[in-house]
Design a protein with these regions (language model features):
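A signal for specific C-terminal beta-sheet/loop modules enriched in small/flexible residues
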Residues: 89-98, 142-152, 163-166
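Mixed-charge, glycine-accented linear interaction segment located at domain edges/termini
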Residues: 151-183
Length: 195
């Protein structure tokens, strides 16, 4: 099922963000770590645009929570609006037993591992059940991600996007301008800049 979500970079200190969320009625629900390995058929991922690159990518994800690891292979089918913002996405996911063997298979098949992403996630929830995912991304900084819940399912994608954006901006944090941050692509762009 397609879901609308926003992801925006936050430039406040972690402690200030956590205090701001608590002040707005949010409490910590869970913590976990994601390790993502993105693979594509393109030999040089740096030459493609984001939509083409992601449409050709498979990712191997490891989720570490409470000293347990689960692994899966994911394909993200993202729908972009005319401005290149992600208006919705659908994830196709299958569990795998062994992250490293799966990575080795993809490499042996000639796929290019164009991005490795690690982020620590802290999920906050308010009394209505609305969740905010605070993400501490290695090499990039702090992000907030929020996705639609049952209360806005019947709205259009644009209305959902605007609702989520307004919800996040209401906290008063120092936010980036892009509410559709593409973290893997940001890492790729950072690699380009350093070369």
């Amino acid at each position: 099922m397609r879901k609308t979500e926003i992801t925006v970079q936050v430039f406040d200190k972690l402690l200030d963000i956590e205090k701001g969320l608590a002040k707005n009625g949010y409490h910590k629900k869970e913590e976990y770590c994601l390790r993502d390995h993105y693979f594509t058929k393109f030999e040089n991922a740096k030459i493609g645009d984001y939509k083409t690159l992601l449409a050709s990518s498979i990712l191997i994800r490891t989720i570490e929570e409470d000293e347990k690891c689960t692994h899966c292979m994911i394909y993200k089918n993202k729908k972009l609006d005319q401005n290149g913002n992600v208006s919705s996405e659908e994830k196709i996911r299958v569990k795998i037993d062994d992250e490293q063997n799966c990575i080795n298979i993809l490499r042996s098949a000639g796929l290019n591992n164009w991005c490795n992403l690690k982020n620590d996630n802290i999920v906050y929830v308010d009394k209505s059940g609305f969740e905010i995912d605070l993400q501490l991304v290695d090499g990039l900084g702090i992000f907030i991600e929020a996705e639609e819940d049952q209360s806005i399912r019947e709205l259009s994608e644009k209305q959902k996007f605007d609702y989520l954006k307004n919800k996040i901006t209401s906290f008063g944090f120092c936010l980036g301008k892009d509410y559709s941050c593409k973290k893997p692509y940001m890492i790729l762009q950072n690699k380009k800049t350093r070369q």
